[in-house]
Amino acid sequence: MVHVPLAVLGEKIKKVLVIGGGDGGCVRELCRYQHIEHIDLVEIDERVVAVCKEYLPGVACSLDDPRVHILYQDGLKYIRRIEDEYDLIIIDSTDPFGPGEGLFTMEFYGNCYKALKEHGVLVNQHESPFYKGDALACQRAHRNIVHSFELSRLFQAHIPTYPSGHWLFGFSSRGVHPVRDLNPDWWNSLGLETKYYNTNLHKGAFYLPNYVQKLLEKVE
């Protein structure tokens, strides 16, 4: 969720908003980029951060970075009052059921659009296309987001700890394209060591299986 938009926008990303993600995983990866100046982490449950700091220190290790500002509040309410502020918004949410359901609505995506700068990008977890229930949730999220942004593309990753292991993520913008605007030379020059991501994989991740394309076409 982090390296894909960074490899596209590069040093244009100065200010980032993460909604959810209280474990600190996204923040840890963001903090590896020295040009990022400010990271707001909006987490509704203070206990999530406290527990992860204690029991998952390898994930939560950057939550005390001076660039990171943790706001314990509802992301739905927070985003409503923000306009033209962030270069990148990452929605590291739970599934679209119960408390997390509001983070998949058209209203929420519209507010994210408003909160981004002109060149800004929204990245969100988009559920799995594999099992029927998850696939329906994926469709609903995609329907809502394509009505909120001029450009929306999905990319996939293999995550064995998630149901089916096949998971989708969204990349949405006013026109920035995740493949055509990729800057592999810049990203590779950073010399970041990653376990999964590389710029060749980046391009391939946006080429989706036929059954996923058909699923998404029904709501586009």
Predicted regions located by residue number:
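Histidine- and/or cysteine-centered catalytic micro-motif in compact active-site loops
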Residues: 94, 126-129, 157
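Conserved Class I S-adenosyl-L-methionine
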Residues: 109-110, 135-158, 170
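SAM/dcSAM-binding transferase cores
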Residues: 164-220
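The AdoMet/dcAdoMet-binding core of the Class I SAM-like
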Residues: 1-119, 131-138, 216
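Generic structural signal for helix capping and beta-alpha/helix-loop junctions
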Residues: 132, 161-162
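Acidic/polar loop patches that form or flank catalytic/metal-binding clefts of enzymes
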Residues: 124, 149-155, 179-182
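Conserved beta-strand signature within the Rossmann-like core of class I S-adenosyl-L-methionine
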Residues: 119-126
